[in-house]
Amino acid sequence: MVQFFQPKPKALPTQAVEITIDNLDHHLTGVGRYQGKACFVEGVLPGEKVSVQITEQKKQYAHARLRQVIEPSADRCEPFCPAFKQCGGCNAQMMPQAMQCQAKQQGVQRLFRQLAKIDLPAPLWIESSAPQAYRRVCRLAVKYDKNKRCVLVGFRQKQSQALVEINSCPVLTAALSALIVPLRTLINELSSARDVGHIELYETESGLAMLLRHNGRPPVKDKELLLAFALQHDCALYLQTTGYPEPLADVKPSFYQLDGLRLYFQPGDFLQVNPQVNQRLVNYVREWLAPTATDNVLDLFCGIGNFTLPLAREAASVTGIEGVDEMVQRATHNAEQNQLVNTGFHRADLTKMAEYANAGWQQQCYDLVLLDPGRTGAEAVMPWLAKSGARRIVYVSCNPVTAARDCALLQPGYTLKQWGLLDMFPHTGHVESLFLFERK
């Protein structure tokens, strides 16, 4: 039998090594040099001399864990959260917010240069966010601890599946943060506590809502405890076992306000977590597309109508395309509730664009196009868009890597005119960006 040679992995150094941090990548991870290659370290600032433990070595790069900051930057801040060093939710509280935004901008520009051969100018604007209490949505992890003989409720540790128990979270709204401790008490009172997978919390203009992921059907006593908790905290409670979430009892509809519109949602739907930045994002989309009363607009990856409905008030028509049936139904309902009769919504898996070549919505002509894909981007859509003939296209991105790839595919038919950056998620490596293309 043929045996293939497999080189042994290079032994990692047992002693800590010292490196100097040169810059930050788009995730706000520090980049230094170790043995002539890039070495990535979290929790550091440019210019700092640090002691690190090498945790992974590849041919072109290495990863390391910070052990000590030997020469700190004058810009280094004291993290405002006591759980920062353990919790995986935030990775940059030791960094001024202006530096975070600058690093994200430079990261996006670098990725576009490397992956798309596009030299982005300085962004037209950089929109920042309130540094704390900006999140109206969160997911809490739940795990049974055999040693403590109780259920832990909190967030995942950095680079680990282990849990960090927290009593509060300063980036959540005050109402969501205040639910964490009573939720932990509640879950530990359930006889089916080990079957709880995770908990999602929402706070919008309609009040509080909670989604509990359960691996079975909770017994009657547990349902009574859950309902009592929901009543005590005036919280709409949903349960997800298999399929889509369902209310555990009669609940008041959940909605959020946007542009004077009321958008109804159900826990489990995608929601922008930062309402203030979301409003600014919608404003910029509307300003850049600049629809008139004669324009037909296409909104790809439309969700429950976050962009569709504001655009419909100015355009002749807006067609929304979304891959999840329930969200298509929700978007249709939202248009009806807001008396917007010039909208239409269709379900389509936009990763399989060729399957919809004969769909009515794809046969229409559009003056303006908006797309807001998830982190995987919109690669399958771009060749069709490049030939669409739309006057303007606005691409909203939450992942600069896939945005660079996708924007390069538009170049045969479109010119990138301007872009902007929104710090939707301060203190994290996530970045929201906006790109305007005009037909050549």
From Swiss-Prot:
UniProt key word Electron transport: no
Catalytic reaction annotation: uridine(1939) in 23S rRNA + S-adenosyl-L-methionine = 5-methyluridine(1939) in 23S rRNA + S-adenosyl-L-homocysteine + H(+)
Tagged with keyword Iron-sulfur: yes
Binding site for [4Fe-4S] cluster: 81, 87, 90, 169
GO biological process: rRNA base methylation
Coiled coil: none
Keywords, comma-separated and alphabetical: 4Fe-4S, Iron, Iron-sulfur, Metal-binding, Methyltransferase, rRNA processing, S-adenosyl-L-methionine, Transferase
Pfam families: TRAM (PF01938), tRNA_U5-meth_tr (PF05958)
Recorded superkingdom: Bacteria
EC number: 2.1.1.190
Purpose: Catalyzes the formation of 5-methyl-uridine at position 1939 (m5U1939) in 23S rRNA.
InterPro entries associated with the record: 23S_rRNA_MeTrfase_RlmD, MeTrfase_TrmA_CS, NA-bd_OB-fold, SAM-dependent_MTases_sf, TRAM_dom, U5_MeTrfase_fam
Gene that encodes it: rlmD
Active-site residues, Swiss-Prot/TrEMBL: 398
Family: Belongs to the class I-like SAM-binding methyltransferase superfamily. RNA M5U methyltransferase family. RlmD subfamily.
UniProt name for this protein: 23S rRNA (uracil(1939)-C(5))-methyltransferase RlmD
Major enzyme class: transferase
Domain TRAM per the UniProt entry, residue ranges: 10-68
GO molecular function: 4 iron, 4 sulfur cluster binding; iron ion binding; RNA binding; rRNA (uridine-C5-)-methyltransferase activity
Binding positions for S-adenosyl-L-methionine per the UniProt entry: 272, 301, 306, 322, 349, 372
